[in-house]
């Protein structure tokens, strides 16, 4: 039995990056051998075991054979006769098919080190086309490392899309890869790669539709809506904003993709149109509730936030209520981060001030100083038995909040 460290940990080590999870391949062993040595079986689709002390994953060397569409359509063959090279050959890219033995020696049968040095993402063999998830993974690695995709690998990615294999992707896996890509240092790179191999139109057609849609040049020097959205998510990444903010940045302008061309470059009503598109996208790829809810709010209200300095106190109070800012203060700050990213995601605007965010934060603080409980108690005593009492309390609290915001704006 021989044990090799493989995959991402070896790759990242060679790149001088922090190593997180470590995966191992075991050659020349059976499941019974592993169990006898104290390893705990956890693999459902193929033999994977947890080390009895470190709890790191150890998988038996295996080969795979395509038997059906999709990334789960494989027959697994794992026996002691499977060699390390055969196991490495089933992997997606050369840079992910490097191993290190227990003595520290590197095994690199497919030229992965040379591709790391050259900054190239290259597939290992023709079996690359059998797993549509690899299209997303290659795009994600492009965003992570800034590497170029080898031309021949790009052609295979296009083939995967053309044959309809991406249609078999499981929604949750699509979201998982998109989420990972959004959290990279330059997430726009992922979407440019997906668009270049024509996968973006299949996976996120609402985002793909934004490219080529013009905006007013005086407000958007980049003009192209798709380019703008890419700048927004890159800005959010540069600020290390969380996933929810980055996803909201990706989807905030989806409504512009449905503007009739004869109305370009204006996009009146795109916020309201975008809400339905965001909801449909989130349902289709199973976006988690936290990311979905923030994206919906940003799509609907980002224009109002940009105009915050011009809004009446009552309009600001309405927005705070509609965004549930009184109860969800942390989410409201994420909401403002996404809107700020929209503002900064334009050529020449990255370092410009965005006072709207602080303006609305102070407005929320002022409105929150209203003691709704005290108002309810006072009205409950003076209007006992009034069937309209709940609505009366609501109106009184609202008026008090508007008053506090008005006072703030009068004395900045």
From Swiss-Prot:
Tell me which domain of life the UniProt entry assigns to the organism this sequence originates from: Bacteria
Details of cofactor binding: Magnesium is required for nucleotidyltransferase activity. Nickel for phosphatase activity.
The entry marks the following residues as binding CTP, namely: 8, 11, 91, 137, 140
Q: Outline the extent of the HD domain.
A: 225-326
For this UniProt record, the keywords arranged alphabetically read as follows: ATP-binding, Hydrolase, Magnesium, Metal-binding, Multifunctional enzyme, Nickel, Nucleotide-binding, Nucleotidyltransferase, RNA repair, RNA-binding, Transferase, tRNA processing
- Name the cofactor(s): Mg(2+); Ni(2+)
General function of this protein: Catalyzes the addition and repair of the essential 3'-terminal CCA sequence in tRNAs without using a nucleic acid template. Adds these three nucleotides in the order of C, C, and A to the tRNA nucleotide-73, using CTP and ATP as substrates and producing inorganic pyrophosphate. tRNA 3'-terminal CCA addition is required both for tRNA processing and repair. Also involved in tRNA surveillance by mediating tandem CCA addition to generate a CCACCA at the 3' terminus of unstable tRNAs. While stable tRNAs receive only 3'-terminal CCA, unstable tRNAs are marked with CCACCA and rapidly degraded.
Description of its domains: Comprises two domains: an N-terminal domain containing the nucleotidyltransferase activity and a C-terminal HD domain associated with both phosphodiesterase and phosphatase activities.
Name the family. Belongs to the tRNA nucleotidyltransferase/poly(A) polymerase family. Bacterial CCA-adding enzyme type 1 subfamily.
Misc. comment: A single active site specifically recognizes both ATP and CTP and is responsible for their addition.
- Name-wise, this protein is Multifunctional CCA protein
Q: Name the source organism.
A: Nitrosomonas eutropha (strain DSM 101675 / C91 / Nm57)
């Amino acid at each position: 039995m021989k044990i090799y460290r493989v995959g991402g940990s070896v790759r990242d080590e060679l790149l001088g990056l922090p190593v997180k999870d470590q995966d191992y391949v075991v050659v020349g062993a059976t499941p019974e051998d592993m169990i006898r040595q104290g390893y705990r079986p956890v693999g459902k689709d193929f033999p994977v075991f947890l080390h009895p002390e470190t709890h790191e994953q150890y998988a038996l060397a295996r080969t795979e054979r395509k038997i059906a569409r999709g990334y789960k359509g494989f027959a697994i063959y794992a026996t002691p006769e499977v060699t390390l090279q055969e196991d490495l050959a089933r992997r997606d890219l050369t840079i992910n098919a490097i191993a290190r033995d227990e003595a520290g020696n590197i095994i690199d049968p497919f030229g992965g080190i040379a591709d790391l040095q050259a900054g190239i993402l290259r597939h290992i063999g023709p079996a690359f086309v059998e797993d549509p998830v690899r299209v997303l993974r290659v795009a994600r690695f492009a965003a992570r490392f800034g590497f170029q995709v080898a031309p021949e690998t790009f052609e295979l990615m296009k083939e995967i899309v053309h044959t309809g294999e991406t249609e078999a992707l499981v929604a949750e896996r699509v979201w998982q890869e998109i989420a990972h890509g959004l959290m990279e240092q330059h997430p726009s790179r992922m979407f440019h790669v997906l668009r270049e191999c024509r996968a973006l139109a299949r996976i996120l057609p609402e985002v793909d539709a934004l490219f080529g849609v013009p905006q007013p040049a005086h407000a958007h020097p980049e003009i192209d809506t798709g380019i703008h959205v890419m700048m927004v998510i890159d800005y959010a990444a540069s600020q290390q904003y969380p996933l929810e903010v980055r996803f909201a940045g990706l989807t905030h302008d989806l409504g512009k993709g449905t503007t009739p061309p004869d109305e370009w470059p204006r996009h009146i009503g795109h916020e309201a149109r975008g809400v339905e598109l965001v909801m449909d996208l989130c349902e289709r790829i199973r976006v988690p509730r936290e990311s979905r809810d923030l994206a919906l709010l940003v799509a609907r209200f980002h224009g109002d936030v940009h105009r915050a300095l011009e809004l009446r106190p009552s309009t600001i109070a309405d927005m705070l209520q509609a965004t549930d800012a009184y109860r969800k203060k942390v989410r409201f700050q994420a909401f403002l981060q996404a809107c700020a990213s929209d503002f900064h995601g334009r050529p020449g605007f990255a370092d410009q001030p965005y006072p709207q965010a602080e303006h609305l934060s102070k407005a929320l603080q002022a409105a929150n100083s209203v003691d709704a409980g005290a108002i309810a108690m006072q009205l409950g005593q003076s209007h006992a038995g009034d069937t309209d009492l709940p609505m009366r309390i609501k109106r009184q609290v609202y008026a008090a909040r508007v008053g506090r915001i008005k006072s703030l704006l009068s004395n900045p």
